[in-house]
Amino acid sequence: MLIVADENIPLLDAFFQGFGEIRRYPGRSLDAASVKDADILLVRSVTKVDRQLLEGSRVRFVGTCTIGTDHLDLDYFAQASISWSSAPGCNARGVVDYVLGSLLTLAELDGVALAERVYGVVGAGEVGGRLVRVLHGLGWKVLVCDPLRQAAEGGDYVSLETIVQQCDVISLHTPLQRGGEHPTWHLLGPAQLAQLRPGAWLVNASRGPVVDNIALRELLLDREDVHAVLDVWEGEPQVDLQLADLCTLASPHIAGYSLDGRQRGTAQIYQALCRFLGVDEQVQLADLLPRPALAQVELDASTDPAWALATLCRAVYDPRRDDADFRRSLSDDPQLQRAAFDQLRKHYPPRREIEGLAVRLRGESPQLAQLVSALGGALV
């Protein structure tokens, strides 16, 4: 059996060497010739997998180690009887950590209390749903927009217009859909952006085209009170340099790039392939994850909760490091800039998740205990 895989998928050998030969290629360079003789294709979001890539090949299973599937032509897969799997939720915690770190930075810049802001989460799937649970656990006011879940479940969902008009913070977590009943391409365009509240914060860690980047650039040129945090970009790895300069925080599509999340994505595709082949799993992710460099933090029960929140989040992740690295990589030469974008992702340093952090409290503090629980840490 021949497996063709994106070279940047972690733990390829550990999970897949027992199935046969593995050939690695840069994800953006995969073409029909590369996959012609493959039985299994393993990709990330940078590879468009469609008829043009697969027609005439032996591929019968496609696995993408990502949450999103907008790079997969699922209609063609159905026509060609090609099985597939994504990795839903694999990096959800990493994205939540990214958002929390960004909020802490913006709060310090504006001198505001996070607990006093109104949060709007657009898209309540694996990532957005987890973020909502964390924010609710912290006791913060959250409005949620998800028309698909609202139609299926009912509940206290609100419209996008309500989010834009009433929320101080908007965090986007939708898949990219260009058509259908609820398209998300340019979900936030000129009309929506013009309605942002004074001092609004906008975070996009979903897909670049969910926000009209040109319209956002024009808004930021006109309104210095608005903060934008962008991890995803229209046309990436090409980046609008002026827009990047106007963003308060900017990064190269790494919000979900925690070590745990990336390896969890590989593990989920391995499990799906085992089911497809009808074989038992022989490898477990828990046996492969290294011990975190920082495994435990100790807090006194008298610790200020706001300080504790910042300390715990930044003990695990601080987006300002990624922002600085990204800005240093930007270049007026489009070819150099695209290459730098991919290199930052390829050589991204190990980053763990807050759910792997143990917290010991000296004394009793129900408020701190609730904070740790909301973040997903473990009280010991």
From Swiss-Prot:
GO terms for biological process: 'de novo' pyridoxal 5'-phosphate biosynthetic process; pyridoxine biosynthetic process. It is found in: Cytoplasm. Catalyzes the oxidation of erythronate-4-phosphate to 3-hydroxy-2-oxo-4-phosphonooxybutanoate. It comes from Pseudomonas putida (strain GB-1). Homodimer. Pfam families: 2-Hacid_dh (PF00389), 2-Hacid_dh_C (PF02826), DUF3410 (PF11890). The keyword Cytoplasm applies. The active site is at R207, E236, H253. It is an enzyme of class 1 (oxidoreductase). NAD(+) binds at D146, T174, A205, S206, R207, D231, G256. Belongs to the D-isomer specific 2-hydroxyacid dehydrogenase family. PdxB subfamily. This is Erythronate-4-phosphate dehydrogenase. It catalyses: 4-phospho-D-erythronate + NAD(+) = (R)-3-hydroxy-2-oxo-4-phosphooxybutanoate + NADH + H(+). GO terms for cellular component: cytosol. Its EC number is 1.1.1.290. GO terms for molecular function: 4-phosphoerythronate dehydrogenase activity; NAD binding; protein dimerization activity. Keywords: Cytoplasm, NAD, Oxidoreductase, Pyridoxine biosynthesis. The gene is pdxB.
